[in-house]
Design a protein with these regions (language model features):
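Typically the conserved alpha-helix immediately C-terminal to a functionally engaged Cys/Sec
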Residues: 35-50
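A short beta-strand-turn-helix
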Residues: 5-24, 65
Length: 117
């Protein structure tokens, strides 16, 4: 895959996250959030490193408030790992790709890779 998908509806979240057959990173963010802009290139690195083994999506909490509330997102960026439709790990704040990998346990979740950052 290697690209980041914008989620703009509950149906898209259901399809691209909850029904995904591969692990999914969900970046809960907002356009006005400075740290969210800082973490964006780090997520691009992860998308490139993991390719087809991992999906990365962005959920704008201003557009998708119901999803953010459902998952108890109180700070952004919140970066969550979903596996088989379940939230299994999360990290909060702007972090380097390698730290995000460690916080989310990505190597064990995908059986793969490591970001080059």
């Amino acid at each position: 895959m290697g690209k980041i998908i914008d989620i703009n509806s509950r149906a898209a979240f259901q399809r691209d996250v909850l029904e995904a057959e591969i692990p999914v990173i969900v970046d809960f963010w907002a356009n006005w959030c400075g740290p969210c802009k800082v973490v964006a290139p780090e997520l691009e690195l992860l998308a490139k490193a993991y390719g087809e083994d991992l999906r990365i999506v962005k959920v704008d909490v201003d557009v998708n408030q119901d999803i953010a509330v459902e998952y108890g997102v109180q700070s952004i960026p919140t970066i969550a790992l979903f596996r088989s439709g379940e939230w299994v790990a999360a990290t909060v704040g702007a972090k380097r790709a390698r730290v995000i990998e460690g916080d989310l346990g990505l190597a064990s979740a995908t059986g793969a890779h490591e970001a080059t950052n």
